[in-house]
């Protein structure tokens, strides 16, 4: 049986998949319903169609009205968006873009650093890249009634709230609010879609804005680079061979880099489990204390782990304290936190649990337990 793949289906599904991986919704059906409803609203507001089409026979007549229905005017809409070509961070090789630096006082930098520290989008950035973000952001003061962004407009900036209260409107209906924290405006910059909502100030406030070019150059490009590095790392981990590419990509997004110097203790025997570690670069030394030793603090080296190997999963699987200490021999490790470990590694659990038996055999061989 032959099936015709309609034009636009691949792009549509790819965009939806990216949105799912980014948002990680708990209810996929509800998210899909909201996503495609919003997409339909944007298409109507643009007076066009974004969807899938089958190639009709030459003699077929179309019964689709070419004129879009007239829509009620939106009191928030100032101008309709004509979206630019989608930004592909993987294809961006421009290294000549001038970096923007807006002067800031020490007090302003401290406030901005506090405002951005918990923003998920910035999690993949290292310290130097975060300083680039802070340098490139500029202050924008608002008063009650100011519209920061309007539904249907082009995306120009990404905003982080320093202080103030802001209402969120979709199709003239208030759907939420921000108070003294939060961020908004990234979706229009990431996907080249019109603004999906209107944000209006209800009090005096201060925002920090990052322009479209800087947002893409610093945030999206570096996030894509980091994801690519992590995906290549995870491909070398044997237990992840069975994962689908999208599962590995989801896992890569959950990794956070931590850097350790030679001799640093990464995890200590007896501590609670905080995550599962994957070695991005360098080496790690595994050491254990024996209850039978005359010196209870004496440790015995049991293994050396290299790039692509992992450790720390046994304490997560057994809910027991760390069974060994791990020390950095060289530099960098990746951490997958406990919540992400449990959420994302279901397909790998059986493989990991088999390591428990191996670990018990190794402990018995080394210490006679």
Swiss-Prot record:
Ranges where the record places region Dimerization and phosphorylation: 1-120
Any one GO molecular-function label of the UniProt entry = cAMP-dependent protein kinase inhibitor activity
* Key word Phosphoprotein present: yes
For the biological process aspect of GO, one term held by this record is: adenylate cyclase-activating G protein-coupled receptor signaling pathway
Its cellular-component GO annotations read: cAMP-dependent protein kinase complex; cytosol
- Positions carrying Phosphoserine are 81
Show the segment(s) annotated as Disordered: 56-79
* Binding residue positions for 3',5'-cyclic AMP 2: 239-365
Q: Where is the composition biased (Acidic residues)?
A: 58-69
Q: Can you tell me which residues bind 3',5'-cyclic AMP 1?
A: 121-238
Task: Name the keywords, alphabetized.
Answer: cAMP, cAMP-binding, Nucleotide-binding, Phosphoprotein, Repeat
Assembly behavior: Tetramer, composed of 2 regulatory (R) and 2 catalytic (C) subunits. In the presence of cAMP it dissociates into 2 active monomeric C subunits and an R dimer.
PANTHER family found in the cross-reference section: CAMP-DEPENDENT PROTEIN KINASE REGULATORY CHAIN, CAMP-DEPENDENT PROTEIN KINASE TYPE I REGULATORY SUBUNIT-RELATED
* Similarity remark: Belongs to the cAMP-dependent kinase regulatory chain family.
> What is the designated name of this protein?
cAMP-dependent protein kinase type II regulatory subunit
Q: What species is this protein from? A: Strongylocentrotus purpuratus (Purple sea urchin)
Taxonomic lineage of this organism?
A: Eukaryota, Metazoa, Echinodermata, Eleutherozoa, Echinozoa
């Amino acid at each position: 049986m032959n099936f015709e793949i309609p034009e636009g289906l691949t792009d549509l599904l790819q965009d939806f998949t990216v949105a799912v991986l980014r948002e990680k919704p708990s209810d996929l059906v509800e998210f899909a319903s909201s996503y495609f409803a919003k997409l339909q609203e944007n298409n109507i507001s643009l007076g066009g169609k974004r969807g899938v089409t089958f190639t009709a026979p030459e003699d077929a007549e179309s019964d689709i009205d070419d004129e879009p229905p007239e829509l009620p005017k939106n009191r928030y809409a100032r101008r309709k968006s004509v979206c630019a070509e989608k930004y592909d961070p993987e294809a961006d090789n421009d290294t000549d873009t001038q970096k923007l630096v807006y002067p800031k006082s020490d007090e302003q930098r401290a406030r901005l650093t506090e405002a951005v520290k918990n923003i998920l989008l910035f999690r993949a950035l290292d310290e130097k890249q975060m300083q680039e973000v802070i340098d490139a952001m500029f202050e924008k003061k608002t008063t009650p009634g100011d519209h920061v962004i309007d539904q249907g407009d082009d995306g120009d900036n990404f905003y982080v709230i320093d202080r103030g209260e802001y209402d969120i409107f979709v199709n003239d209906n208030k759907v939420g609010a921000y108070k003294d924290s939060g961020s908004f405006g990234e979706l229009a910059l990431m996907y080249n879609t019109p603004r999906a909502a209107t944000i209006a100030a209800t009090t005096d406030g201060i925002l920090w804005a990052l322009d479209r070019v800087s947002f893409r150059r610093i945030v999206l490009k570096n996030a894509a680079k980091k994801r690519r590095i992590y995906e290549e790392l995870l491909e070398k981990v044997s237990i992840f061979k069975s994962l689908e590419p999208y599962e590995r990509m989801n896992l890569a997004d959950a990794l956070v880099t931590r850097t350790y110097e030679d001799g640093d203790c990464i995890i200590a025997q007896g501590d609670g489990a905080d995550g599962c570690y994957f070695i991005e670069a360098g080496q790690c030394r595994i050491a254990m204390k024996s209850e039978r030793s005359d010196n209870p603090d004496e440790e015995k080296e049991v293994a050396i782990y290299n790039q692509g190997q992992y450790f720390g999963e046994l304490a997560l699987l057994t809910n027991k304290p760390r069974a060994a200490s791990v020390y950095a021999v060289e530099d960098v490790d990746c951490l997958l936190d406990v919540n992400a470990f449990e959420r994302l590694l279901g397909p790998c659990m059986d493989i990991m649990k088999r390591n428990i038996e191996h670990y018990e055999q190794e402990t018995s061989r080394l210490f006679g337990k």
